[in-house]
Amino acid sequence: MVPPRTVPLFVLPMGIFPLTQEPLRVFEPRYKQMLDDCVLEESSFGYISTVNPPEGIGGWALPSEYGVLCVADNLEEQGSNLLFTASGETRFRVLDILPASLPARDFGEIFPSVDELVEEYIEESPDGKLYLRAEIEELPPLKGIVHSDRWNKLVRRWSEHIVAIDSLVRASGRGREDVLPIMEGEFLPYTESGLWSACQSILDGYDDRQRALSSEEASQVIDVLENALEEKRAQMDAIRFMMESE
């Protein structure tokens, strides 16, 4: 087992999954400091969702239990913002949280610089940071695989869900015969990357996302995906029934 280590935390409502990517923009001093530290130290950060129900520490949103170690790729400045791509790698579990050196404050539309804020705590806490950190344990790779029949069925159901949403909002007008070949070309045969991409696309509930991240086996992850798609199908049927009844 990999020994525990301390990492910066990037806390947002949804989080990310391993082997997936997400373009992000930061403007807060705490996350600018975090990115500077990660670039200088060539280290990763922990991208993690906020805990549900919400709790805080020093005014900052507390993280959930499970997250994903990420590297910051394609970092660039755009005015006062930093743009980058979070590239998910391995999963982790939070063991202990290290608070930020300063409490949360509302700065309005104009943020102070990182250096100005560091001056407020550097004497009392020379090793402090503006961002939350955590002692974590990295989780091992998923055990096993999803067998082809089960995975192929999930890709078909996923395609049908995409078509159902498209039909409901009257978007592209694409049918199953249009969407399924695209999905099969992208996600067949089974790969762990495809499994996590499905999680990123399908799972929008806090409990489902945490359950997937905490899984030990690939079969447990696809259990979560199958249940989520079934719930979404029932929701779509209910919405369609209400619309037809009006």
Region annotations inferred by a language model:
Residues M1-E246:
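N-terminal low-complexity, acidic/polar interaction/targeting segments
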